[in-house]
């Protein structure tokens, strides 16, 4: 399916209760409900994919990986949660794409963009000496006789992913980057980066670990319970409390 179709899909968005009914059917083995959930959430997946473009990967490949994250979120979503499905799904989709990129090794940046990035770096050094200050993007573009947007694109493409994704929790050197949430101007509104960071920073260490294991490591509540030495019921209760706390703080921030 063409990327533009995914990006500009005009399917009417489902209401939250409709989404949850489809999730219930899907979790009970209804393949049609599962397929419809994918179809209706293409825009959601594509919005996440846009965060990872210009990394040397085909958008279609990233979209397919994102759909795997979407399906995992369908399978793992607890219907007793008082939270929108999209709020739960976005971190899962992000995590799936990040794992794909991490497991694939060094992020592949196209050779032409790499070469342009090197030219920009040299031009920046030369202009800094000449001007006695850091040159603007437009000055670099004029110097190289290219468009300013090409300068921005090349710099973004060769930048290390670790400098783009801000770490909000780290466990044994493995960072959680839930701040890779995306802003959206439609009625489906997701976590704001700064507010989310503040909400997570207010959690207790055990609560942060639960967020990390559940939303970044994709562990089940039973696996988290075993890791923490508590029951699955306790994990479920704590997770609901955490989501409610974050939701309240996010709502307060939005207000």
UniProtKB/Swiss-Prot annotation:
Q: What happens when the gene is disrupted?
A: In spo-63 (loss of residues 27-255); no spores develop, no induction of sporulation-associated enzymes.
Q: Where is this motif: Polymerase core binding?
A: 61-74
Quote the protein name from its UniProt record.
Answer: RNA polymerase sigma-F factor
What does the UniProt entry list as the effect of changing residue 73 to F?
In spo-563; 10(6)-fold decrease in spore production, 50% induction of sporulation-associated enzymes
Q: Name one Pfam family in it.
A: Sigma70_r4
- DNA-binding region per Swiss-Prot/TrEMBL record: 221-240
Induction profile = Association with RNAP core increases during sporulation but not tested stresses (at protein level).
Origin organism is Bacillus subtilis (strain 168)
Q: Which GO terms describe its biological process?
A: DNA-templated transcription initiation; sporulation resulting in formation of a cellular spore
Which InterPro entries is this protein grouped with? Cro/C1-type_HTH (IPR001387), RNA_pol_sigma-70_dom (IPR014284), RNA_pol_sigma-B/F/G (IPR014322), RNA_pol_sigma-F (IPR014236), RNA_pol_sigma70 (IPR000943), RNA_pol_sigma70_r2 (IPR007627), RNA_pol_sigma70_r3 (IPR007624), RNA_pol_sigma70_r4 (IPR007630)
Keyword set for this entry? Answer: DNA-binding, Sigma factor, Sporulation, Transcription, Transcription regulation
Can the keyword RNA-binding be found in this entry's annotation?
no
- Give the family per the record: Belongs to the sigma-70 factor family.
Q: Give the GO molecular function terms.
A: DNA binding; sigma factor activity
Stated regulation of activity? Interaction with SpoIIAB inhibits sigma-F activity throughout the cell before the formation of the asymmetric septum; after septation the interaction is confined to the mother cell, and sigma-F activity is released in the prespore. Fin, a second, forespore-specific anti-sigma factor is induced in 2 successive waves by sigma-F and sigma-G, by antagonizing sigma-F it allows the switch to sigma-G factor and progression to the late sporulation development stages.
Q: Please give the subunit comment from the record.
A: Interacts transiently with the RNAP core.
Q: What does this protein do?
A: Sigma factors are initiation factors that promote the attachment of RNA polymerase to specific initiation sites and are then released. This sigma factor is responsible for the expression of sporulation specific genes. Interaction with SpoIIAB inhibits sigma-F activity throughout the cell before the formation of the asymmetric septum; after septation the interaction is confined to the mother cell, and sigma F activity is released in the prespore. Responsible for expression of csfB (the anti-sigma-G factor Gin). Associates with the RNAP core only in stationary phase cells.
């Amino acid at each position: 399916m063409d990327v533009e179709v995914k990006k500009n899909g005009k399917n009417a968005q489902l209401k939250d209760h409709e989404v949850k009914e489809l999730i219930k059917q899907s979790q009970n083995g209804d393949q049609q409900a599962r397929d419809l959930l994918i179809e209706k959430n293409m825009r959601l997946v594509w919005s996440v994919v846009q965060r990872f473009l210009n990394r040397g990967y085909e958008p279609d490949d990233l979209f397919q990986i994102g759909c795997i994250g979407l399906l995992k979120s369908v399978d793992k979503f607890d219907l007793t949660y008082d939270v929108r499905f999209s709020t739960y799904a976005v971190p899962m989709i992000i995590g799936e794409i990040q794992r794909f990129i991490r497991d694939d090794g060094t992020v592949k940046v196209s050779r032409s963009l790499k070469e342009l990035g090197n030219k920009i770096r040299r031009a920046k050094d030369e202009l800094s000496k000449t001007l006695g200050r850091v040159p603007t993007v437009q000055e670099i573009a004029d110097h190289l006789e290219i468009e300013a947007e090409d300068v921005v694109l090349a710099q973004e493409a060769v930048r290390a992913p670790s400098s783009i994704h801000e770490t909000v929790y780290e466990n044994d050197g493995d960072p959680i980057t839930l701040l890779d949430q995306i802003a959206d101007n439609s009625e489906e509104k997701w976590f704001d980066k700064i507010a989310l960071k503040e909400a997570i920073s207010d959690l207790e260490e055990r609560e942060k670990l639960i967020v990390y294991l559940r939303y970044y490591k994709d562990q089940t509540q039973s696996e988290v319970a075993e890791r923490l030495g508590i029951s699955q019921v306790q994990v479920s209760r704590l997770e609901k409390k955490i989501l409610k706390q974050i939701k309240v703080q996010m709502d307060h921030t939005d207000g």
